[in-house]
């Protein structure tokens, strides 16, 4: 399993822990931190125009939590987030919802905010 590293990750984890320590956060409370992580990582790779839309409009195929844009009105991927600490991403990845999403939305990342799955690629923050 690969590991994320670098400044964007440090800031992201610091924000995650701050939100978690409040004790009353819902899944959506972590969305700004996740969007910022992806934006920062894109910038580190010279992709300064990447835009993240949290909770985009619903489509016929469903509604992943995020859409990732290339800055030129082309969707380059999607992110489906589950609550922080969700340990059964493998089970979730085999659910009807995720099967439908994968068949409809290319480049779908499944995450619990510390583990990220894109197809057979699994990356964790720890």
Regions found by a protein language model. Give the residues of each.
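A short, conserved, highly charged catalytic patch centered on acidic carboxylates
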Residues: 1-107, 115, 119-125
């Amino acid at each position: 399993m690969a590991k994320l590293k670098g400044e964007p990750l440090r800031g992201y984890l610091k924000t995650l822990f701050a939100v978690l320590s409040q004790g009353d956060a819902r899944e959506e409370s972590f969305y700004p931190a996740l969007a910022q992580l992806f934006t920062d990582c894109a910038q580190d790779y010279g992709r300064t125009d990447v835009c993240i839309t949290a909770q985009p409009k619903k489509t016929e195929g469903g509604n992943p939590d995020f859409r990732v844009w290339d800055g030129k009105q082309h969707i380059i991927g999607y992110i489906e987030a589950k609550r922080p600490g969700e340990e059964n991403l493998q089970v979730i990845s085999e659910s009807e919802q995720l099967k439908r999403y994968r068949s409809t939305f290319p480049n779908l990342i499944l995450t619990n905010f510390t583990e990220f799955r894109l197809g057979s690629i699994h990356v964790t923050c720890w």
